[in-house]
């Protein structure tokens, strides 16, 4: 009853509702409805149909369904996804209306039975997207929804309901009461009419949908495209209480998006649907053809637009021209209103790209540029000629010019040429002009004119040309530098020879090549017929001023041929030499007689005279003649030296027949009178056809001795009166004979006594020499000559001379001489042999004995070279005296004197130094200008051999050069850098080219830079002097800023170079550091001790230093310097001189490798053993960085570690920022730190390796091992990319190219730090040497190894001479062999000598394992020999 009552109530309510709403169309599916009138239909393209349910006809209807009549879908009876369509009748309503319907969705378990959707199809078009949908389980009741479709006449639409079965397939969907109401919907908003939108392609399209109703009724706003796409609303804006605006935007629409669009609101209670509006997309127009060129000029182009055919939509409302340079980023647009257009203000010779732009209405209506016209303007005449013509370098025969870079604004054409035209005068009279024009390369602003004449005015101008014209620049005049002059013409040399003089005249060179400043004439005797003249003689030089073209050479030897060389000099040096040979005339012989000697004997008819040999002058004596002349009473007597001699031979018989007063009594060949011998005049003998008759007792005679020289038809003779015989009287004849006999006896007695004295004197000299005592040979010679001249004097006079000689022997002995006077006696010979061996095996040179001020002491005797090693070891271990005590003893006397009397001590000190101070010649008007802080220091047996001075300050530079000039110094030794520890230690007192210091002009002639020192050669000229001095400066650059050098190898080589380069007759050697004390003193002591060790086999360092300190204060400043001197002398004695001249290398090497049978060894093996003994061993403290725990894994072996002092610390940052790598910086012969020796990179050090290469600017890598060597504990991996690019930490390594032959693989890499790209890249060439087998100590081929050295050298020159990384397995033996070989080749090229020991020793000072084995050391000799032999075959 209750259910029946409820049903009746529901039916009553429904009837009331229907009566009040009165729908104009629809379907309620009730029993009394005519279903044919409902105008709905089932879909034809769905899966199943809707089921009509009438509950009163179904008694067994499930309780899940409501009662009544409706359409229903049972989800459980259909498959998931199947659809059922219900189509409502087509509607064309012009007024506002509402489509209302009820729906039922229920599932007992709450699952969704499916989805119910509503679609609105317009004008039979596509269904599109659903305008409304619902899903889920909504309970066992009906829900009502509305569709507010805003369509306007004549459009019609049809609503389609769709049920889709869910995957759960449970429950029911129902549809009922589909009614068309003629009033607005209350649950869905109504849209106003939506208008069409037109936009240009690429623009944004905006639809604005205005809806009436409650905005809250709309849960979503959508725009639906007719094809089905859905666009969400961009924004929703309330216009009033019941009106709101939904905006939809389509971005950058294209032609393909042109379609119909409508607005939709959606909610569970219904949807609002607008009419379809069209989106119209217009394509902006673009010309089909490019514009047409009508005419081109240098600054304009005239074109025709050519816009008749277009692509896109019209109408065209604007035309524009867009143009730009084809190579430029900018563009310009000009509006055009005509079919032709002229583009102005264009650049000449420039390519332009010109396009036409067309525009239609609307935003974005401008189309893409049409096809471009590419055209080039013509060239224009150059703006002007190039300016700024100037020289960058002027030499004597070439001129390097530069000018302003030629920009486009100047050339106004890309096709142009620059010609450099020049002219200058030529010919002997400079009456001809040489002209030439050189065409420059493009973009060049620098050019070198070569093959010019020195010291000429060169007139130069630049001409700029292009196809439209040319511009000539102003002519600029330059003057080439001077050059050495040409040679003096040999035919211009004229001369007049005399006996001991030659007059020589010459003319100026035909090619002076500058201003002649000086002539230099050198002459040397090269041949002489006089055996007393030594040929070749010393070479002497005479300098003449530029206006003096003649000279008289005096003090020449007669009969001697001299080679004269004449050369002219300009500011650039001397020119070619003109040579001529001139022979002096022979001169008359000379006699060694003083006053007329007494005859040796005399009788009535004879007289015995002493004939002494004459000295030929220019020619040997050919004949001696004895002339007898009767001394008549009234005859004019001949005076000795002034008389005319007897050129015509005359026998006795001829003289008698002619009545001559003289005759030739004898003619003696020169060979018969080689020493003084008696001759009896009147002995009645015949000599060479001349009778020597007895003299007449009653006549007085003058006896003449004549010598004759004859050479090449030229005869010279000289005579001297040697005796006078008085006439005999009969009464006195016996007495005279008795007197003569007594005189003869006296003479013989005196001669015998003199001979005894002479023998005693010579014996004493021999004894002294054998005892090793020096003898003043000059004085001894004088005494001997004095004795010989006065042989006839008293015998006690001779003994007086001898006692004088003995007194000279007892003179005080010098420091150096004392060592020769020591009591070593018999030990000397053994010491000589030992020291000679230690000094290199060369014979000891002859040492001069000129005295020395170094006085030895008894407490500190000299040390034998053989005992030096033991002595130094004892001193270092503090056994005995010790270095510290010896060093401090140098200053004990100074302290005592200061305590006693400071004023006096200081005054004595000053006066002591002042005695040895260098005093300059005062300048005019400045008497105090004689001071310079410099002292004379004695060398070994050479007084004042050194000048110790301070490094010149700026204000003292002129005084320094005055001293060098005044003292005729040829060598300057500098042992400091200009700046050390941030402080100026010495001013740069020399020029880089040429500079005046006061009145002294210093010119740098040449410079030679080596790894440890530099040699600069200067020419000194002084105003008012014609002489020109050459001075060499030896600048040692390897002395560290603190302490002393780590090893003495380089310093010893430096000292030897200075000694070898200093002429023996030069002035003192100037030595300076900063203060002229410590380092200067070390150098002097080493120089003196090296000479002492070589000459005496001993060294006396202590007394040498002591004496030095008495000459100049603080000559040895620290105990460290004192110890260093000992170590350096020891190294010199152990190693000796090991350099070999290139010319002697082959025989020397052959001797060195010869096996001695007794020792079964060779000199080369012993030299290598010496190398091992002097190689320093590294202590743990010296390798502290390599031994740090964090660095252990970066070492291949803990036995081969680099010392801290040689480490190249890494600069590039990478991760942990560790800056250590197992590598060492080492010198070559010519460059400091030229090599970086390292081991083959490990897997964890590859990045470090490339950091090292980049940080230290290494342009070459030399690899001497093979990859994956089996004898390695770690595999040798490839550490480079090939091909391609690879990153190693911050380093980017790119393989650029490669080449290979049978010996070497060469690869080129580009390396850069990607964290510092602004630094640019580094080009590195990698040389992998293939000919060194894994188990060999030396390369397989010397020739291939030389090939490697040559390739690396060539690349180093091309790449700017960067450092070279050398590596093998452990960075030792092989790497050392390569570095040593490079050094040896540098020695040969620089100095034409090789010193293999020095090269190996230098490298081992950095790493003891360099040149590791005897075979590798031997190979270095082989490489030197191979290279020298290759030079001979070139």
UniProtKB/Swiss-Prot annotation:
- Enumerate the InterPro entries for this protein: ConA-like_dom_sf, FN3_dom, FN3_sf, Ig-like_dom, Ig-like_dom_sf, Ig-like_fold, Ig_sub, MAM_dom
The record's subcellular location field reads:
Cell junction; Cell membrane
Q: Where is this region: Disordered?
A: 824-851
| Gene3D superfamilies (UniProt xref) | 2.60.120.200, Immunoglobulins, Protein tyrosine phosphatase superfamily
Polar residues compositional bias: what residue ranges? 824-839
Swiss-Prot/TrEMBL catalytic activity: O-phospho-L-tyrosyl-[protein] + H2O = L-tyrosyl-[protein] + phosphate
Keyword Membrane set for record: yes
Boundaries of every MAM domain copy:
25-187
- The catalytic site is made up of 1073 (phosphocysteine intermediate), 1368 (phosphocysteine intermediate)
Which EC numbers characterise this protein's activity in its record?
3.1.3.48
User: Could you say which residues form the signal peptide?
Assistant: 1-17
Positions in the Extracellular compartment = 18-748
Q: Which ranges carry the Tyrosine-protein phosphatase domain?
A: 876-1132, 1164-1427
Residues crossing the lipid bilayer are: 749-769
Question: Which residues participate in substrate binding?
Answer: 1041, 1073-1079, 1117
UniProt GO molecular function: protein tyrosine phosphatase activity
The membrane-topology field of this record reads:
Single-pass type I membrane protein
Q: Which residues are glycosylated?
A: 74, 409, 684
Q: What domain of life does the native source organism fall in?
A: Eukaryota
GO biological process terms, alphabetically, are:
cell adhesion; cell differentiation
Q: Which family does it belong to?
A: Belongs to the protein-tyrosine phosphatase family. Receptor class 2B subfamily.
Q: Output this protein's name.
A: Receptor-type tyrosine-protein phosphatase U
